[in-house]
Design a protein with these regions (language model features):
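Short, well-structured alpha-helical interface segments that form or flank functional binding sites
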Residues: 42, 220, 290
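Beta-rich accessory regions
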Residues: 14-20, 253-498
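Beta-rich carbohydrate-recognition and catalytic domains
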Residues: 1-167, 172-216, 229-286, 309-358, ...
Length: 498
């Protein structure tokens, strides 16, 4: 263990001990979502199954609650709801990555090791350089390849902006390793490039899989390549997008998916036109706080997605917190009816307790949870004939609360945290609901400081975070429609807390 890695590990231990010994701090934190053990986290990394456990690495800065020189933090889980802290996996401690170990992915090898592919950041004079590196590990400790970096500008047969070449996605197919990375072209547009290797150490450039066009975006980040229910798919997070309400995009950073055919002979991705928005890519989650999603396929056949539950554009962590950053609930993915569906992992249902059924008459308000911790699940559905709005309010007073509004007249969903502890630069978000069917189904997962909404059995997701000064609050529903609403509520508790 290098001195830099040892220092990071010591800091992680100190923060974790402080947090776990304080009931006040624990009450600030989510119950079943992963949150940084102290300090800062952003992108999920290396999300994979290895040696009987699910591994989640993440971009980690243990020395403050702001972004800083990147390390790789590491946790493991078996149920994707309870997270066990592991030693810090990577620190910026070699010439290839002395300015940061940026995002990447992980896979298992036939000899029983785990390969991490990550971006090493260094400098050439005053200029930042991003290259790709690898490390090998046993699920606990990781050793960087002595000949890092394994991919540099020398591997790419055209000019690009060398401070924007990152986020390797590594996978294996037909006995060969493949790596997809993103880079910024000289015209400032993002592109996804692909490389091939026999041993994951020496790589050959094969082509541009896909790239931005028609002023779609600037740089792309965090690529993922997968086949979901027989459909080839790319996932990436484009920057510098312009708001297009009808297409489902917002200003700044988005996270999108594209379907089509990945041709391994031409090394090109031929994308479909997405049914949701008539564009080559569609939004994955329409809320404020969702970025850099990453997937893994489990041994039980499920494809699981997890993402950073925060927005670069809107930092809202309270100043006195020892931690900043958490992940979405892991989501089971499927592709059906020509679109992506996502739902919380089925293991979440094991946390359900105290089921309550409630009716809210037309033009009435009801308190569903009274002065409770915000660990709950709420479900309701309304018929296609229902018009008006349904408001879900979390808070104790008119001075501090958050609002989720379902508008069945204009078919929209809206979140407002302007009355929360820290609204941030982006305090509200509005998005179109899917076209009406016989009924609109709403499922809401609340966990202390987040609301994740799943519409119509996972056809749409809408994720937002917030902070309130009180840990126990009311959950109220205002039914501003002409029909009664029948809803079902559960408290969500860990087994040991029951």
């Amino acid at each position: 263990m290098t001195e830099i890695l040892e220092k990071a590990q010591k800091r992680q231990n100190e923060l974790s001990e402080k947090i776990n010994s304080s009931k006040e701090i624990l009450a600030q934190r989510p119950l079943f979502h992963f949150a940084t053990p102290g300090g800062w986290c952003n992108d999920p990394n290396g999300f994979s199954e290895f040696n009987g456990k699910i591994h989640l690495f993440y971009q980690y800065h243990p020395y403050s609650t702001q972004w800083g020189p990147m390390h790789w933090g590491h946790v493991t889980t078996k149920d994707m709801l309870t997270w066990s802290l592991e030693p810090v996996a990577l620190a910026p401690d070699t010439n290839a990555d002395k300015n940061g170990c940026f995002s990447g992915t992980a896979i298992s090898t036939e000899d029983g090791r785990q390969i991490i592919a990550y971006t090493g950041v260094s400098k050439d004079g005053d200029k930042e350089i991003q290259n790709q590196c690898i490390a090998f590990g046993d699920g606990k400790t990781y050793e960087k390849f002595s000949q890092n970096p394994v991919l540099t500008a020398k591997n790419i047969p055209f000019e690009y902006q060398k401070d924007h070449f990152r986020d390797p996605k590594i996978w294996k197919k037909d006995g060969k390793f493949y790596m997809a990375c993103v880079l910024k072209q000289l015209d400032n547009c993002g592109a996804m490039v692909i490389f091939e290797s026999k041993d994951a150490k020496k790589w050959t450039y094969k082509g541009i899989l896909d790239s931005s066009r028609n002023d779609f975006s600037g740089m792309w980040e965090c690529p993922d390549v997968l086949n979901l229910d027989g459909k080839d798919m790319l996932i990436f997070s484009p920057q510098e997008m312009k708001k297009d309400y009808n297409a489902g995009f917002h200003d700044g950073n988005n996270s999108v998916y594209s379907t089509g055919i990945l041709d391994y002979k031409k090394f090109k991705f031929f994308s479909d036109i997405r049914a949701e928005n008539k564009c080559f890519a569609a939004q994955i989650d329409y809320g404020i706080d969702f970025y850099a999603p990453q997937t893994t396929k489990l041994s039980d056949g499920r494809t699981i997605l997890i993402a950073w539950m925060q927005a670069w554009e809107s930092y809202i962590t309270p100043e006195n917190y020892l931690w900043s950053g958490m992940m979405t609930i892991p989501r089971e993915l499927s592709f059906k009816n020509n679109r992506l569906y996502q739902n919380p992992v089925r293991e979440l249902e094991n946390l359900r307790t105290d089921e309550e059924n409630s009716e809210i008459p037309p033009e009435k308000e009801k308190t569903i949870l009274n002065q409770q911790e915000r660990h709950f699940e709420l479900e309701f559905q309304v018929s296609e004939k229902t018009s008006g709005t349904i408001k879900i309010i979390l808070g104790n007073t008119e001075d501090e609360y958050v609002l989720l509004k379902i508008d069945l007249y204009e078919q929209s969903i809206y979140f407002d945290r302007s009355k929360s502890q820290i609204p941030g630069k982006i305090s509200e978000r509005k998005a179109k609901l899917p076209p009406k069917e016989k009924e609109t189904k709403i499922r809401i997962i609340g966990d202390t400081c987040s609301l994740e909404v799943f519409v119509d059995d996972g056809k749409m997701a809408f994720t937002n975070t917030f902070f309130l000064s009180k840990t126990n609050t009311d959950l109220r529903i205002k039914n501003e429609t002409s029909q009664k609403i029948c809803c079902k509520t559960w408290k969500l508790q860990k087994q040991e807390a029951r």
